[in-house]
Amino acid sequence: DLYALYRNVKRGSFIINTFDLPLEVFSNMNQDPRWEMIILTLVEEEYPPGVEKGPVAVVFSYLAGPVYVPVLVGLDYRYQLSHKNYKQICWQVVKRANEVGAETLYFGITATIEKRRLGAQAFPKVSYVQVADSFNMETLELANVASLEAVLTSGGPA
């Protein structure tokens, strides 16, 4: 189930913590010719005995003229170490971007080391937040200052 693979990655991702996309989004992607799915499976003999044979990785990519954008990835983590399914799905994305003649491939913001090995360049990440009520932030800041003062006056951690 491709949606289950997506949710595996989504559940473990804390760099960008968002809500789960509804199943309908994936259905809509499937109807739009600008969206592509790359599905990675193993040869039959590679599946462990008793394990259901199915996709071990998927990527949902968007083709916008000269730009290829892998937007979402899904993984079966049981195959991450043994078959390096994340590395393989990234390589398949690079191959597909070349096949469609994409001039630019936007890989996303996580797993920088793996993507650099495929020739990606990392750019600094910046985010801005507008806070309507800063009470909690100010409280945390006061706690940090108090903790720092305790360390400085005692000569060690509080």
Predicted regions and their residues:
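Glutamate identity and glutamate-enriched acidic tracts
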Residues: E24, E36, E44-E46, E52, ...
